[in-house]
Amino acid sequence: MDLRAADAWCEDRGVDVAFLRVPGTAIGALTPAVRDGFDLLEITTVLRARPGAGDWERGRIRAGTSADAVELGEIAATSFRPWGRFYADPRLRHRADELYRTWTVNSLHGYADFVLVSDDDGPSGFVTGHLDDGVGRLGLLGVAPAPPWARLGVVTRLLRSVLDRFGADGVSRVLLETQSHNRPMQAVLTSSGCTLDSVSACLHKWYR
C-alpha cells in the first residue's frame, strides 16, 4: 500500500476525505496508515451464510419500489445510530442520517440489485441486496422504531427472506457485513447460522 501515492492522488484531485479498508490479513498496514493521518473508526466483521431455498415473499415481505423512497429513507435515517462508522467520524456525524437516507433511496433506484421490504400495514424495515459474480452481498438492513421484541422479529424475517432471495438468484454463498461492536446484530446473525468469514479495519483521513 503506497500511502504517499494515495495522498498525492487525493491532493491533486481535491478530495476532502479518503476511506481506507485494511483486511485482517494485512493488519501490519494499520500502523503506517495511522501515522499518515488516518483515524481508525471501526472494525468490521464479514459473516457468511448459505443461500436459502424458500419463498422470499412469505411473511409480509415484498419487493421495494421507488414509491417506498420516502418511508424507507425515514427508516434509514434513524436505523444505524450509533453503529455506523459515519457516526464515529466527528466531521461526518451531523450528516450521517442524511447519508444513510440517500444510500437507501439510491438503492431503490438501481444502486442495489434488489430491495426487500417488511410491510406491516406500511414499511417496518428493509434490506438491500447486491449480486457479485455468484456471491450475494447484503448491503443495508434498517428497521423502523419499535419495541425491541418487534424489531428482532422484523430483522429475523428480513434475514430469512434475503437469504431465500439470494438462493432464487442462484448465488453460491452470501456475505453479510456488520460492525464488530454491534453485538445485537452479531447475535442475530450467529443465531441465524452465519459464521465468520473475515475481518477488516475501516479508517478515514481528511485532507481539508
Each model region followed by its residue ranges:
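A short, internal acetyl-CoA/4′-phosphopantetheine-binding micro-motif in the GNAT/acyltransferase core
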Residues: 1, 23, 141-151, 178-179
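Glycine-rich acetyl-CoA-binding "A-motif" of GNAT/NAT acetyltransferases
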Residues: 41, 121-126, 184, 197
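A conserved beta-strand-loop-helix scaffold within acyl/acetyltransferase catalytic domains
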Residues: 85-99, 106-145
